[in-house]
């Protein structure tokens, strides 16, 4: 596999571990699996991940940042998610997703996004449940063992490693901003810079301050 037409180099993809799955697979994810290693780990097809990343960023670019909500409960995804929100302006929820955030207009953190982006649909099940209830599209980073019946757009990836998740968020942020004309080919932040900042974010999983308050849209 060459680097031609990839969003980043193959070496960068492999070094981040985005292709390393688990020892479990589902029929839903079979089409994204490249092979199984001798130790039983399923390996994702990097080219398919790259293709889906490109399409996800293109889809998201149809929305204003304030109309997108990106969510994660995974500790190792919090830093990358916060840096993603910082560079794009997209709203983020890190940690516990408070029930009613999308469905209860009386909730303190009630929000009305038009699309939901999940780092792990299985872990972020409360957010997924509410997105299904209100009928908004869901993009999800999915590993080899995921069931995807309620995910509108799948990004196959290792969604458990900090480096792999950081690369996913970096590439989507970069392509989202390019597609919206916010940046040109000269990207003002490199992957290394993004990764360094994401890795240095202090993770404080305090339920009282997990949701960022700037997602207070108008109530219809």
UniProtKB/Swiss-Prot annotation:
CDD domains: RPS2. One of its GO terms (molecular function) is structural constituent of ribosome. InterPro entries: Ribosomal_uS2, Ribosomal_uS2_arc, Ribosomal_uS2_CS, Ribosomal_uS2_euk/arc, Ribosomal_uS2_flav_dom_sf. GO terms for biological process: translation. It holds the Pfam family Ribosomal_S2. Signal peptide: none annotated. One of its GO terms (cellular component) is small ribosomal subunit. PROSITE patterns: RIBOSOMAL_S2_2. The keyword Mitochondrion does not apply. Keywords: Ribonucleoprotein, Ribosomal protein. The keyword Ribonucleoprotein applies. Belongs to the universal ribosomal protein uS2 family. This is Small ribosomal subunit protein uS2. The gene is rps2.
């Amino acid at each position: 596999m060459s680097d031609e037409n990839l969003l980043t180099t193959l070496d960068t993809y492999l070094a981040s571990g985005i292709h390393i799955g688990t020892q479990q697979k589902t029929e839903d994810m079979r089409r994204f699996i490249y092979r199984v290693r001798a130790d039983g780990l399923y390996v994702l097809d990097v080219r398919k991940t790259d293709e889906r990343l490109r399409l996800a960023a293109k889809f998201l670019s149809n929305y204003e940042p304030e109309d997108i909500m990106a969510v994660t409960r995974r500790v190792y995804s919090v830093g990358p998610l916060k840096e993603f929100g910082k560079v794009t302006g997209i709203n983020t929820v890190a940690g516990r997703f408070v029930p009613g955030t999308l469905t209860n207009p009386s909730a303190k953190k009630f929000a009305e996004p038009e699309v939901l982006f999940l780092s792990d649909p299985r872990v972020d099940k409360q957010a997924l449940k509410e997105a299904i209830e209100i009928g908004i599209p869901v993009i999800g980073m999915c590993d080899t063992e995921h069931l995807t019946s309620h995910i509108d757009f799948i990004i196959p990836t290792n969604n458990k490693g900090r480096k792999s998740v950081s690369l996913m968020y970096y590439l989507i942020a970069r392509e989202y901003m390019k597609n919206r004309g916010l940046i040109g080919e000269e990207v003002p932040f490199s992957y290394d810079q993004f990764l360094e900042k994401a890795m240095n974010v202090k993770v404080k999983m305090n339920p009282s301050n997990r949701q960022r308050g700037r997602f207070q849209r108008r109530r219809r």
